[in-house]
Amino acid sequence: MHIVIFVLLAFVAGMLLHRQLVRTREAKVTAMPPPLSSYEASVTTATFTTMVLETSTDKPVLVDFYAAWCRPCHYLGPVLAEMAKNYKGNFLLAKVDVDAEPSLANTYSIKSMPTVLLFRDGRRVAEFVGARQEHSVRFFLAQNGVLPPAEEAADV
């Protein structure tokens, strides 16, 4: 009798857990992440096409693949965010958490973090791996035709 009750309770607990996992997964897929700033956005598998591929037909999109546990990511992230702000919309900074979006990381063969990809016209056109100082990221952007606003261009 105790075994039957135990099996029944285990079954009910499993069903409740399954329902919660399904709800969590649905919430992740349907929820559009809020922009981090007007020049920066958090991107998911569900929003990648719109926020990266389609946006890159109007302006360059710099995609930062990062992980919360990655120390170099903690250095590069603020550098990229500050540059996105300083470039005043000349590119969009899209951030992808590889732990939350493993299929997206796999699609773009992300093996190390941070990895930064540059998209134009819906295509990946350039990339770099590892943390860089601001001047190095500026050079990378300039090499790929992404320039700061006119008032800052003289300082580059």
Task: Mark where each language-model region is.
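Hydrophobic beta-strand anchors of alpha/beta hydrolase catalytic cores
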Residues: L62-V63, L93, V116
